[in-house]
Amino acid sequence: MTRWAVMTPRRDAGRLDSRLRVVLLAVVVLAVAVAVPLVAQTPAQVPVLDGIAAHYRDAARLWRPRLLPIAQQLYMVLASLEFAVSGAIWTLRRDSLDDIAAKFLLKFTLVAFLLAFITSFATWIPPIVNGFAAAGERAIGSSVTVSPSGIIDIGRQTALTVLNTLDVGVMLRNPAMALFGALAALLIAIAYIVIAAELVLALIESYVVLGGGVLFLGFAAFRGTAAFADNLIAYTFGVGVKVFLLYLIVGLGAQIAKSWIPLIQASTFFGPTSPLLEVVGGALIFAILTVRVPGRVAGRLSGHASVGIAHALRALT
């Protein structure tokens, strides 16, 4: 006798559930197989502060070729004005033809040299700043990396290490000391933010000078505006010195600051030998050194420097 299997609703539901599970499992496996390679190929996100400096650096590389024709045209117009003024002075003074020819030749040589200097701006000016930066990197050593986001990371680790000591027991036993610890962590974080901001400003300043400074060299052809070019060259040296000193100070300071984190972890942070105040003081001193020393030294070294373009144009009249 043939037996017919009776399919109940419960058995149908069981089979549907098993099939649904198999389908879902297959979908999950397929999704993981597709997603893992995509995640592996996703590039690492650029840190925020390093990204800001990188954007200005890349933009400055585009500014220079766009501004170079404008600087050259401006230079030619002002050079014509300079020769017109010189010719009027030579005529009014009734100089001899030999004197006029000699001065004209010397002035023409100077103007031609300055035009060649503007045309080859990328050959002369960027190596000044880049050379100072390379010297700073070489001085601090290859094992030390100076970057704004790296400084922020050190500050965050230090501040979080301080905050990790503020457990519930400490807050209940000594609320005032817990408040002091939280304030100390805030001061440490602010100090490192200031250091990173100063480094970002110096880097962006150098990029702006290298990218847009060629325009101010266009004023070098006329005695009344040649001071712009003189000041730009001196300012370029000042920016290079500032970047160099920042690399030295921030590089050494970052190495010192990294040693504070294990010191905090290994000590009784709220005891009589607590290093909390010293760590806060060290972070603030680090910030003050970064803000004051590079700018002051760069100003002293390049503040009164001058190539003498305006003086040379006047002397050859």
Whereabouts are the PLM-identified features?
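Hydrophobic transmembrane alpha-helix segments characteristic of membrane transport
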Residues: 82-108, 200-227
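Non-cytosolic segments of integral membrane proteins
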Residues: 115-209, 248-309
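Juxtamembrane inter-helical linkers in multi-pass membrane proteins
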Residues: 137-139, 211-224, 304-316
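Hydrophobic alpha-helical transmembrane segments
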Residues: 24-31, 74-84
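Hydrophobic alpha-helical transmembrane segments in multi-pass membrane proteins
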Residues: 77, 81, 111, 115, ...
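Binding/recognition "hotspot" determinant
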Residues: 38-81, 88-91, 133
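Long, intrinsically disordered, low-complexity regulatory segments adjacent to structured domains
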Residues: 3-5, 9-25, 282-317
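Alpha-helical transmembrane segments and their helix-start/interface "positive-inside/aromatic belt" motifs
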Residues: 17-26, 97-116, 131-132, 230-242
